[in-house]
């Protein structure tokens, strides 16, 4: 026989070497959706314990960006891993569909409501636009390989959801958390509306920084407090502000009761300043000489009166803890209509909450002659001039500082007292209850707890009303004169909700009050306000989770969003759920960081460093994107660049190559007929299955703790090191040259089969497309999809009490590593070509020699040499090479004999078998005899 190649068990598989993901994935998706994969999973998991990850709705505007991909893929990894862990984990994607960004887009298309189109036409166009945006984003999310109920997502503009949002407001009112008041709220003049905290961003702004004097009305009273008999010139309390435009609303000056204040004489006037700030104030205003006339506590000055610098009335000195020594003068100009701290302290002292600014950001008529009708930020310089003319300006300079701006317009915003509806944090104990609930939630990373606790502890009442067209109406009736809510509000809200459930929010705007109020209609008016969109999304635990049948009435186990949502969706959901149900809407909250480029810079179109998920999928495939996300520690910033994605593609190839090797060597293996019992397997094969079990234990623990980068690290270690660098290399000889149906070969295939069954499941949550592809090439009967399965339970490990236990094989690996170094040196010296041309002698101490001798004649297979023998360490010649292992030296020589054309080992018995004279004795046995026996390697 001359062609012995036909006697080899060469690897063979239809599983392609190249993933070609960009081309293959769309075909897989087509099959998934034609066969209703999501429905198949739901049926397979029916009756299992549930795990509900509630989708925080992205805003229905624009194409998805790389941050969307991170968010959706992380959710998908969790949902799929929970399914493999034995849970029924339905995933219902959602979209946030109301609000200002959509209004602005539609305004560009058809004009403002009430001008070119009616409000009803405008809302209809907004609904249509949002639906188009949802369709576009949905297609991209599906392309990512994210499985969910895409045919029945939840939209906050669904009629039923809109109705349930209104019902959620009704329950908040029933529980006593709603109140109306003229409170200062973040106000955008460009929007003409109040903004939620989450709609506020901070940018640098240059403002006038001014020190202003308020002259004492009763000089004698002030002198008495400081124990001073006379001063030169007027006595003034000095305030420092960077918002001169708020001075028309000033109604007090706040001091800190505990601070020491000094009366300081400068040229021609005496100033009252916090003692600790005198030096810094003098330096700022350019005064080099001053005299301290007297001291007193802030508490001593309470209710003394001072003259407003230009409005001609007196204002009191009041006391507040919000006054600090961080900057300024120790005296804070207080305008209750323009700041939350000012509002609180003004309420305490029963001061007027003045609001001289209109919704367009301009002063109302009657504010001050030079200011009436002026835009507030343009009035800053006017006010500085007025103060200068009145000799009330001590100092002015420009200051660059961080200033709140509208997230949409990027323009500076103001605090402005307006009639609004609020969810009260304290009137029914909502703040206290929310803080208590936070402690029962698992926050991942754990610093999230302290972050949201601080936000809840310090946040003002939540302004939930907006003056917008495209939003869920508040659906309230108030008395024309008293402005009190109708006594039958709960009943009326349900009546409106039923109409909205049938016809959408337009039903409210079309509603004639007489239809629900009867004769009472003449006494009541409809509230024109809409709800903050954060109320829409924040109530989805009630409007969606509580009512979707697949959730079975269970609350959400997890919310997962970017770390900005502590003050956004996590906060609004907590507020509403606690106000309605008295408990948090989630058990776990997981946050991820934001994407940055390879240099750590924020993604920006202007810089040109954005990465489009669509481009990545079209070029590399979604599985590369998924592997990048899975391999990243998402708790901090998430770096992405072409180079980083290339590394992910390289890692993908290593994993795919391992999977392909496994499949190729399972050719012809039927697990039902050909599997070898563990006790009959070659020891090395049992060790390999044990390696898989150890890897699986770590991988499952990492999935359970949402440490997906640890999953990928362990997967890579298993594929590259334990399998690629050792086991898969060693078994090639036995796999290819042993008799096809021998125990030696079937033992190896049994190990490869068990490893493949585990590997495909480890991959499935992260590399979903490739896992599905691999699943369809695995031998044996199996379910249609890996996604309906659970973690593989067929793995087993070596017993620690066995002689050839894991520790034994760890020592063999170390010896092999040292042998490889010697072989590599010999190859570099041109003494040998490949490792099979080598014969090695291992000079080992007694302990190591005993271990190596247990492998008997199979030792050389573990070392990938043609021959290997063990000698006593003390007999090592000088030519033997020392190693990094204590008690081991190695001598290498050329292997004797000739190269067998079948197994490529160098043997001296080639030609000894008359039937097969061209091959070695071992190959002759494998070709024409009963086949060789392997026990260890």
UniProtKB/Swiss-Prot annotation:
Free-text cofactor note: Binds 1 zinc ion per subunit.
Record's catalysed reaction(s): tRNA(Ile) + L-isoleucine + ATP = L-isoleucyl-tRNA(Ile) + AMP + diphosphate
GO aspect biological process, one term: isoleucyl-tRNA aminoacylation
Any one cellular-component term (Gene Ontology): cytosol
Coiled-coil region: none
This enzyme's EC code(s): 6.1.1.5
Positions with a binding annotation for L-isoleucyl-5'-AMP: 561
Binding-site residues for Zn(2+), renumbered to this chain: 900, 903, 920, 923
Keyword Ligase tagged: yes
Residue window of motif 'HIGH' region: 58-68
Cofactor(s) needed: Zn(2+)
Record GO terms (molecular function): aminoacyl-tRNA deacylase activity; ATP binding; isoleucine-tRNA ligase activity; tRNA binding; zinc ion binding
Xref: PROSITE patterns: AA_TRNA_LIGASE_I (PS00178)
Role: Catalyzes the attachment of isoleucine to tRNA(Ile). As IleRS can inadvertently accommodate and process structurally similar amino acids such as valine, to avoid such errors it has two additional distinct tRNA(Ile)-dependent editing activities. One activity is designated as 'pretransfer' editing and involves the hydrolysis of activated Val-AMP. The other activity is designated 'posttransfer' editing and involves deacylation of mischarged Val-tRNA(Ile).
Family statement: Belongs to the class-I aminoacyl-tRNA synthetase family. IleS type 1 subfamily.
Name used for this protein in its record: Isoleucine--tRNA ligase
């Amino acid at each position: 026989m001359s062609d012995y190649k036909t006697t080899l068990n060469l690897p063979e598989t239809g599983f392609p070497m190249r993933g070609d993901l960009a081309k293959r994935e769309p075909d897989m998706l087509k099959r998934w959706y034609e066969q209703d994969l999501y429905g198949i999973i739901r049926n397979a998991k029916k009756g299992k314990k549930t795990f509900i990850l509630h989708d925080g709705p992205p805003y229905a505007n624009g194409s998805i960006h790389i941050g969307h991909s991170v968010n959706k893929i992380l959710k998908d990894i969790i949902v799929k891993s929970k399914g493999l862990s034995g849970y029924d984990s339905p995933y219902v994607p959602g979209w946030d569909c109301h609000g200002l960004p959509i209004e602005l887009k539609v305004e560009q298309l058809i004009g403002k409501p009430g001008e070119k189109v009616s409000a009803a036409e405008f809302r209809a166009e907004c609904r249509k636009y949002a639906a188009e945006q949802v369709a576009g984003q949905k297609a991209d999310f599906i392309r990512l390989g994210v499985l969910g109920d895409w045919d029945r997502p939840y939209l906050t503009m669904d009629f039923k959801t809109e109705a349930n949002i209104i019902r959620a407001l009704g329950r908040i009112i029933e529980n006593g958390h709603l109140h109306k008041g003229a409170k200062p709220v973040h106000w955008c003049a460009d929007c003409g509306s109040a903004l939620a905290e989450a709609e506020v961003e901070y940018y640098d702004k240059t403002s006038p920084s001014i020190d202003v004097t308020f002259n004492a009305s009763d000089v004698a009273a002030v002198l008495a407090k400081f124990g001073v008999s006379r001063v030169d010139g007027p006595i003034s309390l000095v305030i420092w502000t960077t918002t001169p435009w708020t001075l028309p609303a000033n109604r007090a000056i706040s001091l800190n009761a505990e601070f020491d204040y000094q009366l300081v004489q400068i040229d021609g006037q005496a100033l009252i300043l916090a003692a600790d700030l005198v030096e810094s104030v003098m330096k700022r205003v350019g005064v080099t000489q001053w005299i301290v006339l007297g001291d007193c506590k802030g508490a001593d000055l309470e209710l003394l009166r001072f003259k407003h610098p230009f409005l001609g009335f007196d204002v009191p000195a009041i006391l507040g803890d919000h006054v600090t020594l961080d900057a300024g003068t120790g005296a804070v100009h207080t305008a209750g209509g323009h700041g939350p701290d000012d509002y609180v302290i003004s309420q305490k002292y029963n001061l007027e909450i003045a609001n001289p600014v209109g919704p367009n950001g301009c002063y109302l008529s009657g504010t001050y002659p030079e200011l009436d009708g002026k835009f507030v930020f343009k009035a800053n310089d006017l006010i500085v001039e007025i103060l200068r003319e009145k000799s009330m300006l001590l100092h002015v300079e420009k200051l660059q500082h961080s200033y709140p701006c509208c997230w949409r317009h990027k323009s500076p915003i103001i605090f402005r007292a307006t009639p609004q509806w609020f969810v009260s944090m304290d009137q029914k104990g909502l703040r206290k209850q929310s803080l208590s609930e936070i402690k029962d939630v698992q926050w991942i990373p754990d610093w999230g707890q302290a972050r949201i606790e601080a936000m809840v502890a310090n946040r003002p009442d939540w302004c939930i009303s907006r003056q917008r067209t495209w939003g869920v109406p508040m659906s309230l009736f108030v008395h024309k004169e008293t402005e009190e809510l109708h006594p039958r509000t709960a009943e009326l809200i349900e009546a409106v909700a039923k109409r909205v459930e049938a016809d959408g929010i337009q039903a409210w705007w079309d509603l004639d009050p007489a239809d629900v109020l009867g004769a009472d209609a003449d006494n009541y008016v409809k509230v024109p306000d809409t709800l903050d969109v954060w109320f829409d999304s924040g109530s989805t635990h009630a409007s969606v989770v509580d009512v979707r049948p697949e959730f079975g009435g269970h609350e959400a186990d997890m919310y997962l969003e970017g770390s900005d949502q502590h003050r956004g969706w996590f906060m609004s959901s907590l507020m509403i759920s606690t106000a309605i149900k008295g408990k948090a809407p989630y058990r776990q909250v997981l946050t991820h960081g934001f994407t940055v480029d390879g240099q750590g810079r924020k993604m920006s179109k202007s810089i040109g460093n954005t990465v489009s998920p669509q481009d990545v999928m079209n070029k590399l495939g979604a599985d590369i994107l998924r592997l990048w996300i899975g391999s990243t520690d998402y708790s901090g910033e998430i770096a992405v660049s072409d180079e980083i994605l290339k590394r992910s593609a390289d890692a993908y190839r290593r994993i795919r190559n391992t999977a392909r090797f496994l499949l190729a060597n399972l050719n012809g293996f039927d697990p039902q007929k050909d599997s070898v019992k563990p006790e009959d397997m070659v020891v090395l094969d049992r060790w390999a299955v044990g390696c898989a079990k150890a890897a699986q234990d770590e991988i499952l623990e990492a999935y359970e703790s949402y440490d997906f980068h640890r999953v990928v690290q362990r997967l890579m270690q298993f594929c590259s090191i334990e399998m690629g660098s050792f086991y898969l290399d060693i078994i090639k000889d036995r796999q290819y040259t042993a008799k096809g149906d021998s125990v030696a070969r079937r033992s190896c295939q049994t190990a490869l089969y068990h490893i493949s069954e585990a590997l495909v499941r480890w991959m499935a949550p992260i590399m979903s497309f490739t896992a599905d592809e691999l699943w369809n090439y695995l031998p044996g009967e199996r379910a249609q999809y890996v996604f309906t399965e659970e973690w593989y339970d067929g793995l087993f490990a070596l017993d620690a009490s066995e002689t050839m236990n894991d520790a034994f094989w760890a020592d063999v690996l170390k010896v092999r590593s040292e042998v490889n170094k010697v072989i590599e040196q010999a190859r570099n010296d041109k003494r040998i070509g490949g490792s099979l041309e080598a014969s090695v002698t291992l000079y080992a101490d007694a302990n190591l020699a005993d271990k190596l001798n247990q492998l008997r004649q199979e030792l050389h297979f573990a070392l990938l040499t043609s021959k290997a023998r063990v000698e006593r360490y003390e007999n090592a010649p000088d030519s033997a090479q020392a190693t990094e292992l204590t008690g081991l030296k190695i001598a290498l020589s050329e292997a004797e004999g000739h190269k067998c054309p079948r197994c490529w080992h160098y043997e001296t018995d080639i030609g000894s078998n008359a039937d097969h004279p061209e091959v070695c004795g071992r190959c002759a046995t494998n070709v024409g005899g009963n086949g060789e026996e392997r026990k260890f390697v």
